[in-house]
């Protein structure tokens, strides 16, 4: 079966966190523990809660759900943990268990999940946000959810170098020809929040191969993170079917890419979908990962200094750090940022649900960006870009925030 029962999810979470020996190595790297300094905000505290819940030592309550929801799922604790306890995965399972016992997901998450399950509604929302930007009313939206997009045209006007680069370098590992079926997975965040960046991604991909057009569904991460597991699995099956004929599936959203690469784990016990899911996950690549494989060079070198923010779902979710940096070094000057891989506080809807904590995390990121002296901070995740756009505005014009597809 591809759907675990509530008890199975809790049992699995208990097994995951049972490896925690409470050493506390996770606490210094947890952004939320750094903000709150409370045991339950860090992985050690959450692991203790999950284990007690699985063992029957504490009762499931709505308050307990609030505690496990207060997690960025950034995986910083997992990377630091000597035992590699997957606290993020355990928290997702515990959330699902507690959500089901509470009678279902919160109404706002059901609403968001319902919107993202319908591509036509997502497209309509994208058009509405575009209209708001043109009218100047986007600033009325809270939490930066209708950001002003700093486009490639703006960028080239301000930072264009004297000459475009030459032809692309020979492929370093994978040969992609006109016969290779490369598909672009356009995430909801890119389509609604940063459509110009999504268009730039398509333009870049067309320079490397003949792009296969596919109208994908949401990756399902918002559903998985908020106790809507059935919706997540339904979307996963739809995307697996849609992309079965593609050779490569490229994502320019770190969150989408990480989710799609791990779909196989959710169907490991389902004979009907196990192999199909594994085949799909195996051909998903991040945009920068793909471009490194085919030897892509930026379209133009800019008179700009870049710095880079590592999305959690790219650096820890996919283990990708160097490809985006190498592309930025080829596109202009590059300077490394302090704590570049620390979460920006976006984490899906976390910055909406917990604006104070997210704001404190983001303020640290702003200071680190400004210390680089860079003119542009670049990232590869629309969720992160929403956050970075906020601090770019707060900086008073000291820097701009852009998706990597817009500068290469």
Regions found by a protein language model. Give the residues of each.
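Non-heme iron-sulfur electron-transfer modules
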Residues: 1-6, 33-63, 84-112, 397-405
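Generic structural signal for well-ordered, non-membrane alpha-helices
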Residues: 25-28, 48, 66, 130, ...
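Iron-sulfur cluster-binding electron-transfer modules in prokaryotic oxidoreductases
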Residues: 9-10, 87-408
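N-terminal glycine-rich anion-binding loops that anchor highly charged ligand groups
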Residues: 25-28, 39-42, 209-213
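Generic start-of-chain signal for non-secretory N-termini
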Residues: 1-18
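Cysteine-centered iron-sulfur cluster-binding motifs in ferredoxin-type domains/subunits
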Residues: 14-33, 61, 65-85, 341-342
